[in-house]
From Swiss-Prot:
Coiled-coil blocks: none
Molecular-function annotations in GO: GTPase activator activity
Top-level lineage group: Eukaryota
Protein name as annotated: ELMO domain-containing protein 2
PANTHER family in UniProt: ELMO DOMAIN-CONTAINING PROTEIN 2, ENGULFMENT AND CELL MOTILITY
InterPro entries tied to this protein: ELMO_dom, ELMO_domain-containing
Gene from which this protein is expressed: Elmod2
This protein's record includes keyword Cell cycle: no
UniProt GO BP: regulation of defense response to virus
Entry keyword Cytoplasm: no
ELMO domain sequence ranges: 126-282
Pfam (any one): ELMO_CED12
Length: 293
């Protein structure tokens, strides 16, 4: 109740008068003051909040503007806020960077979601080719005897046909597994080998798909904003999402071995512990979580 009242008074009264007072004192609007004071993710995050909670429709709509309309949008913001480009020469550049990151994050979520919604289809030649590529990347010296085979368990799938394991994350789970195996082949082989440990082993592919779900949920909840705003000086793309996934795979393997779980039966418990650790790291305004090998 108290929190709700504070949010109401802050949003409707206190924030307005505080902004007005600061503008009178500095001669600059809130957006300009943010650019003068902050850098990196803090700058973009605060600009996003300022635009989102503004009562001005031009500013509100800026967080959803199409990239083709970016320059016009910035010109409209400057007009609304009486900002002279000759007096504040950096405003347009700074605002453009922030809006590319803000709108890019929203687009990235939609792109990831669209891929996630696509189910694995064994009748799709591209899907089948990708699955067989995963096998060849992880088991280069061992031939797969048949498409439906118990051999899939060697790389951590549950049944004879991996397609059933992709139901939750769709083709996104396979794309991530292939991306890590192709771009970090040595690390993938090492992790696969460790996943076969007699006591601390786990199902490599199943855990990989589970970590796709973790990366997706963090993106959806906007927990990845600070990381991506720090890491990408423009529009974040699927490539950056895959890179974050690789970080999770590498770090989870280290975490699992360090924790020495009693058995795989405790996977969900340790998975949640790892999840909380990652969320804590992502709350740091200087967060940049990249795989360092």
């Amino acid at each position: 109740m108290f929190v709700s009242l504070w949010e109401f008074f802050y949003g409707h009264f206190f924030r307005f008068w505080m902004k007005w007072l600061l503008r009178q004192m500095t001669g600059k609007c809130e957006l300009q003051r943010i650019f003068d004071t902050y850098g990196g993710a803090q700058r973009t995050y605060r600009i996003e909040n300022s635009l989102t909670y503004s009562k001005n429709k031009v500013l509100q709509n800026a967080t959803r503007v199409a990239q083709s309309e970016l320059d016009r949008c910035i010109a409209n913001i400057m007009k609304e806020k009486n900002i002279c480009s000759e007096k504040d020469t950096s405003f347009q550049i700074c605002m453009r960077t922030c809006l590319l990151q803000i709108t890019g994050y929203k687009q990235l979520y939609h792109d990831v979601e669209n891929v996630r919604k696509k189910p694995y289809d064994s009748a799709n030649a591209q899907h089948e080719k990708m699955l067989l590529k995963l096998w060849s990347l992880l088991m280069p010296t061992k031939k797969l005897t048949a498409r439906i085979s118990k051999q899939w368990a060697d790389i951590g799938f549950q049944g004879d046909d991996p397609k059933t394991d992709f139901r939750g994350m769709g083709i996104l789970g396979l794309i991530n597994l292939v991306y890590f195996s192709e771009n970090y082949t040595s690390e993938a082989h090492q992790i696969l080998s460790r996943s076969n440990h007699p006591k601390l082993g786990y199902s490599y592919a199943i855990v990989g798909i589970n970590l796709t779900e973790m990366a997706y949920s963090l993106l959806k909840s906007e927990a990845l904003k600070l990381h991506l705003y720090n890491f990408v000086p423009g529009v974040p793309t699927m490539e950056h999402f895959h890179q974050f996934y690789c970080y999770l795979v590498y770090e989870f393997d280290k975490f699992w071995l360090e924790e020495e779980p009693e058995s795989i039966m405790y996977f969900n418990l340790y998975r949640e512990k790892f999840h909380e650790r990652i969320k804590g790291l992502l709350m740091d305004c200087n967060a940049v979580l990249t795989l360092k090998t």
